[in-house]
């Protein structure tokens, strides 16, 4: 997909995260569930899909004609990084045709000792036409990743790193400051549970939104409502 066409398609819109980890009820070994989630999202007006693993991404791209933000979650010894951590995952995501390749952009080092910014620079050197999104938690991380070549910066990791522990609600001030200071397009992701929050995130300066738990993870949403 042409970059400008993609930008125009997702601007101001809702990207739905369709993911199920192995311990979750909607996970199956053969897949097939997340493409159905993606179809439902597409029929309801989603402008894109965020998905994990080559299998799910491939099945989703066959099911819907929407841009896909692709990741591969994998734990590595010696680092808290787990979202598209090495070039091996990058190669696999590029090979399956992700429209936007998302990587963890937080301050921890990767297994080879590289920073998120260095990793993004390496991706852009190898795949100069590939759109890259950095999942960040702080203003400084977002700026560093954008300066390294990230086309999008997501607020995905805010509240999930030692530096941002306790940030359990969507922070509109953070989104606004990030949109003012960071040269990349900002994608608000994480802690968005209600339509009013989505609207305020866009008003704060987000280019687009990613929502998962409130739409495609019934366990997460039920827990939120029940407690």
Enumerate the language-model features and the residues they cover.
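Conserved N-terminal beta1-alpha1 strand-loop-helix module at the mouth
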Residues: 2-88, 140
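Surface-exposed amphipathic alpha-helices with a cationic face
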Residues: 7, 42, 57-62, 117-127, ...
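Short beta-strand/loop segments at the ligand-binding rim of alpha/beta enzyme cores
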Residues: 13-14, 64-75, 125-133, 181-189
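Catalytic beta/alpha-barrel core
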Residues: 47-53, 82, 100-112, 131-137
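Catalytic cores of alpha/beta
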Residues: 88-89, 139-148, 193-206
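Glycine-rich phosphate-binding active-site loops on the catalytic face of alpha/beta enzymes
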Residues: 102-109, 154-163, 206-221
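Short loop-to-alpha-helix "cap/lid" segments that border enzyme active sites
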Residues: 116-122, 137-139, 147-155, 165-183
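Conserved small/polar residues in nucleotide/adenosyl-binding loops
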Residues: 222-227
